[in-house]
Amino acid sequence: MSGEGDTTLKAICYKPGSLQLLDQRKLPLETIYLEIRDASDGWSAIQEMVVRGAPAIAIAAALSLAVEVFNFHGFDGSASDAVAFLENKLDYLVSSRPTAVNLADAALKLKHVIAKALATATEAKSIFKAYIEASEDMLEDDVVSNKAIGNFGLSLLRQQAKNPDKLSVLTHCNTGSLATAGYGTALGVIRALHTQGILERAYCTETRPFNQGSRLTAFELVHEKIPATLIADSAAAALMKDGRVDGVIVGADRVASNGDTANKIGTYSLALCAKHHGIPFYVAAPLTSVDLSLSSGKEIVIEERSPKELMHTHGGLGERIAAPGISVWNPAFDMTPAELIAGIITEKGVITKNGNDTFDISSFAKKITGNSSR
């Protein structure tokens, strides 16, 4: 399916029994949607970077399995067999991108849904129905969550800015509609600033080696007619020294309970530069990106990707540019310590520090849970 002629930026196009993912490897030159028929297609699309961005990965994985079971014809097993089938498929999908906690979190929540359904189900189709409905809810909930992040981020940046009516911000990688179900996290905050008429300029890094900034974020910013400038990754420090930005805002693939954050490679460098220049550095992410089982970022598994992404143009898809025989180290993410982060913007509010260098996200989560249960 081709997306040509459709001006709406959507990474995920879904209806019951059908899923297409925008092939982000082709952007911004081609807009092509790939048909995803089952969990195997979903795994490959995630692993091969057809779809990327922690929230979008989780939703695409869940829906790929939803499409598979929707189109089942004559599953012979029992309700218990259906649960076992889904659990095995979810474990398989989680292996596609181990650093992004949203994917593992979504799988765990879906396992809870089908386990609960098993208590009353008499046949497999009841289990599959419960799974499909829960997956579809995740798609809808992500957009609502992103808009809340945008609004909280808007308020925070205005409160802490020297001139709250004119703000310029720097972002890294891609955290917009293409990385989520819609609207975006860090880019959603930028979108909210623009909507309110107080964004002077958004700066985005190219984000090598896969160029998510130059290919995807720049594409979204131009599409939304947001005033924006693309910079080389290595120009960020000079940009800050010149006083061109009021804040740096990035997304997250996994946040430990103390606030240490794993995000696209280069994030740590930006945080260090921001600290040196006295510029606030923010993380914008849904609470599904937080892994409370991890006490610090030292426990986060950092994915390493193919050397080809550095040795060839276009993130490994183009012609060779590196000298034959050179060794390559290509981590996809790095870990930014909490001490460099000014605040973590979530859909439930902004997490701040309690007078030390780290965050107490567990207490924040408990407070939110307590308030929502009243």
Curated annotation (Swiss-Prot):
Its EC number is 5.3.1.23. GO terms for biological process: L-methionine salvage from methylthioadenosine. Catalyzes the interconversion of methylthioribose-1-phosphate (MTR-1-P) into methylthioribulose-1-phosphate (MTRu-1-P). InterPro entries: IF-2B-related, IF-M1Pi, IF_2B-like_C, Initiation_fac_2B_a/b/d, M1Pi_N, NagB/RpiA_transferase-like. Pathway: Amino-acid biosynthesis; L-methionine biosynthesis via salvage pathway; L-methionine from S-methyl-5-thio-alpha-D-ribose 1-phosphate: step 1/6. Its main location: cytoplasm. It is found in: Cytoplasm; Nucleus. This is Methylthioribose-1-phosphate isomerase. The record marks C173 as: Transition state stabilizer. The keyword Nucleus applies. GO terms for molecular function: S-methyl-5-thioribose-1-phosphate isomerase activity. The keyword Acetylation applies. GO terms for cellular component: mitochondrion; nucleus; plasmodesma. The modification N-acetylserine is found at S2. It comes from the Eukaryota. Belongs to the eIF-2B alpha/beta/delta subunits family. MtnA subfamily. The active site is at D253 (proton donor). Keywords: Acetylation, Amino-acid biosynthesis, Cytoplasm, Isomerase, Methionine biosynthesis, Nucleus. It catalyses: 5-(methylsulfanyl)-alpha-D-ribose 1-phosphate = 5-(methylsulfanyl)-D-ribulose 1-phosphate. It comes from Arabidopsis thaliana (Mouse-ear cress).
